[in-house]
Amino acid sequence: MNMIDLNSDLGEGFGQWKMGDDNTMLSIVTSANVACGFHAGDPAGIFQTLKSAHKNQVVIGAHVSYPDLVGFGRRNMDVSSNELIADVIYQIGALKGLAVAAGTTVSYVKPHGALYNTIAHNEYQALAVITAIREVDDNLVLVGLAGSKLLDLAQENGLRTVAEAFADRAYTPQGTLVSRREKGSVLHDANLVARRMLQLVTEGGVEAIDGSFTRIQADSICVHGDSPDAVEMARQVKLTLQQAGITVRSFI
């Protein structure tokens, strides 16, 4: 692999409360997963992030979530298929409207938090998200966890998919993310993270939390924008990859 996308979750501030440094991150990443108001983000803040993304020629995705502002979208929800379909359609539609006003477009969908993790293995909710995307625009790309059943299911239903790996998260030997409740699940050393992502691209996998090698085939790397180390981490990952002759660009 000589090309990879670098993405980040942005637009997650709320009113006077700021989350991350969106403007700086948008000068580094090639794709931006922009909050749609259900787990974070207010209309004015989202609009500003979209305008900044457009200015930096960054591709935009809808970062859809369960309706969970208090829990930042990290709490599982047992919702009906119809409710989840409507929630996802609503969020994509809202972001599309703001994107048009900002002079840009929404090109993909990446679910957030608990929804992201649930649909990686829960076919019932996965099909609801896939249906919602197709109802709005079947040209939208779905970004999901590398190696998950979701990606196969989405492809079977006519969606283009992108497999994603996480720069700042530890992996199990099975290639899944280590739970945030466990020690060592979140990585903070920018140099270590950069070396791991170079290994991912050049060797097709990373060292798991137990020291074994786990295979991960990914088209995009995510650096979480809410991490205090996000800017340095994203910058170091991009620089390390580019110095190794790897092109960092969006999958669109």
Curated annotation (Swiss-Prot):
GO biological process: carbohydrate metabolic process
Keywords (A to Z) from UniProt: ATP-binding, Hydrolase, Nucleotide-binding
Gene3D superfamilies from the UniProt entry: Glycoside hydrolase/deacetylase (3.20.20.370)
The enzyme's E.C. designation: 3.5.2.9
Keyword Hydrolase: yes
GO molecular function, one term: ATP binding
Signal peptide span: none
Family the UniProt entry places it in: Belongs to the LamB/PxpA family.
Protein name as catalogued: 5-oxoprolinase subunit A
